[in-house]
A protein has these predicted regions:
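Conserved hydrophobic/aromatic beta-strand scaffold that supports enzyme active sites
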Residues: 39-43, 61, 80, 88-90, ...
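Ligand-binding loop in jelly-roll beta-barrel domains
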Residues: 80, 84-85, 93-118
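A short, N-terminal "cap"/entry segment at the start of jelly-roll beta-barrel domains
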Residues: 1-36, 51, 120-121
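Conserved short histidine dyad/triad with adjacent acidic residue
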Residues: 27, 40-56, 93
């Protein structure tokens, strides 16, 4: 029988942070023995941002849970898109990007990937 894993909010796993962005995993290889998926909540404080980065081994899907900001992308981060609660973002493997919090409260993002362990460059 396949085992279902429920991760409680006080059991989340802090991951590698990217600049001011903090990620807490709820579904991961360590927590759930996941083999093809990963899910976390990422938070960015007011007037802060993540580092510029890309993922070499996975696609990402992001849902803006609360707050607002800019999502920079493109070869030189030349594309600026406003993001806010309810927006979805698809990030292909290898796509350079950087979320920035421009709002007056914490920017909260739900992040899902198609691999349990990401490689960030």
């Amino acid at each position: 029988m396949k085992k279902i894993i429920v991760t409680k909010k006080n059991e989340l796993e802090e991951e590698i942070n990217s600049g001011a962005m903090i990620r807490l995993a709820g579904v991961s290889k360590n927590l759930s023995n996941a083999t093809n998926i990963h899910m976390a909540i990422a938070t960015i404080p007011k007037d802060r941002c993540s580092t510029t980065h890309f993922h070499t081994n996975c696609e990402s899907a992001i849902y803006v849970l609360s707050g607002k900001g800019l999502f920079l992308h493109g070869n030189n981060l030349e594309i600026e898109e406003e993001i806010s609660q309810g927006d979805f973002i698809f990030v292909p493997e290898g796509a350079l990007h950087q979320p920035i919090n421009t709002g007056d409260k914490v920017l909260e993002l739900i992040v899902a990937r198609n691999t349990p362990i990401e490689i960030v460059e």
